[in-house]
């Protein structure tokens, strides 16, 4: 894959998106990026990794046998030495997630590896790892993942990943 586009117009393509996001986050847990960038105006503690059948227990024995939520994925990532940079709007909707993540990171001694920025006019959406860039219209919310029709692009071109990383660092 260099570039893959997903339009979530129906249940099948929404599952394709869920599978792609799950794969990206599993990959991150195995080999964390420095940092993982999550740019989304709206963010919620959505279900990201489906471990209800225990299929990831061999890789992650600490995973409970249920859906693993975004907040937990970030904590698992920090426990593995990764870092996370989140940009979102300063909305009340996002506040609980931001505050909870920053508090938990501080309590566990990971505060230097979590950065949360807010911008009132933020509209861009993207997830950037060291290997893939996901962009499009989707917020990291239940509606963005499971309800609304979204257009998403996954790109693992090293040139694209490097360019986006430079842009995000600025």
List PLM regions with ranges.
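PLD/PLD-like phosphodiesterase catalytic module centered on the HKD motif
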Residues: 1-170
């Amino acid at each position: 894959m260099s570039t893959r586009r997903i339009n979530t117009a129906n249940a099948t393509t929404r599952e394709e998106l869920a599978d792609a996001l799950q794969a990206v986050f599993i990959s991150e847990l195995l080999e964390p990026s420095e940092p993982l960038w999550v740019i989304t105006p709206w963010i919620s503690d959505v279900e990201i990794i489906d471990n209800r059948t225990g299929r990831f227990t061999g890789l992650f024995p600490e995973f409970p046998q249920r859906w693993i939520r975004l907040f937990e994925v970030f904590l698992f990532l920090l426990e593995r030495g990764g870092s996370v940079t989140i940009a979102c709007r300063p909305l009340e909707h996002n506040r609980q997630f931001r505050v909870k993540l920053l508090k938990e990171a501080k309590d566990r001694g990971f505060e230097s590896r979590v950065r949360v920025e807010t911008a009132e006019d933020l509209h861009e959406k993207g997830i950037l790892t060291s290997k893939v860039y996901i962009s499009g219209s989707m917020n990291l919310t239940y509606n963005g993942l499971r309800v609304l029709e979204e257009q998403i692009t996954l790109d693992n071109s090293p040139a694209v990943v490097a360019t986006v990383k430079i842009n995000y660092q600025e």
